[in-house]
């Protein structure tokens, strides 16, 4: 069940959902707007010939932050990691979904590639996967609205919420834009080879 504005306010007032810093004026009819922090992780393309999720590539990205009140300029075709200004904390019976802002999407800014889901029990900054699919550079201003958080109530509280030891929870408590930790539990299923002569239709 998607929570309405009154449900979101009630959950925040009760302390079950925490947004820090919190501005009540950011609540929408069925979501709450989240804002952009000032730090970004930029990919260092010259350091590796390829990206491999199976191994740690410690210096694949570099943390950068514009000085003062300057914007970060995202160029056409560029992909960087950013993060929300807000630290988001969810209880065991609520999951979140981060959606982009329509007004920014119409300018060619994608807020996330695939990772818009937020597990019950999560606490931390939400890492953003920012892409510019427009033909002109886009200025990203610190503190601007960058996305909207929708909240969904589970049928029952999660038996093992995010942060439980059973799941590892690689991003619990993350601060700022956090690079991929896929290598920590990278697994592969056995995939049978295709017999000779069976390639193609």
Swiss-Prot record:
It is an enzyme of class 3 (hydrolase). Bifunctional enzyme that catalyzes both the deamination of dCTP to dUTP and the hydrolysis of dUTP to dUMP without releasing the toxic dUTP intermediate. HAMAP family: dCTP_deaminase. This is dCTP deaminase, dUMP-forming. InterPro entries: dCTP_deaminase (IPR011962), dUTPase-like_sf (IPR036157), dUTPase_trimeric (IPR033704). The record marks 116-117 as: Important for bifunctional activity. SUPFAM superfamilies: dUTPase-like. DCTP binds at residues 101-106, 119, 127-129, 148, 162, 174. Keywords: Hydrolase, Nucleotide metabolism, Nucleotide-binding. Homotrimer. PANTHER family: DCTP DEAMINASE. It comes from Parafrankia sp. (strain EAN1pec). One of its GO terms (molecular function) is dCTP deaminase activity.
């Amino acid at each position: 069940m998607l929570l309405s504005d009154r449900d979101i306010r009630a959950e925040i007032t009760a302390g079950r959902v925490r947004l820090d810093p919190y501005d009540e004026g950011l609540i929408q009819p069925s979501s709450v707007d989240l804002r952009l922090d000032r730090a970004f992780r930029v990919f260092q393309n010259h350091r590796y010939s390829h990206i491999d999720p199976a191994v740690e590539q410690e210096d694949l990205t570099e943390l950068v932050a514009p000085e003062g009140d300057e914007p970060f300029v995202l160029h056409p075709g560029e992909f960087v990691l950013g993060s929300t200004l807000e630290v988001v904390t969810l209880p065991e019976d609520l999951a979140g979904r981060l959606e982009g802002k329509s007004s920014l999407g119409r300018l060619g800014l994608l807020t996330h590639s695939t990772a818009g889901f937020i597990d019950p029990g999560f606490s931390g900054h939400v890492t953003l996967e920012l892409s510019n699919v427009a033909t002109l550079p886009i200025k990203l201003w610190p503190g601007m609205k960058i996305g909207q958080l929708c909240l969904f109530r589970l049928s029952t509280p999660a038996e093992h919420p995010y942060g439980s030891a059973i799941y590892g929870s690689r991003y619990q408590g993350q601060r700022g834009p956090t690079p991929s930790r896929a290598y920590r539990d990278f697994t592969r299923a056995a995939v049978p080879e295709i017999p000779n002569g069976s390639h193609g239709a």
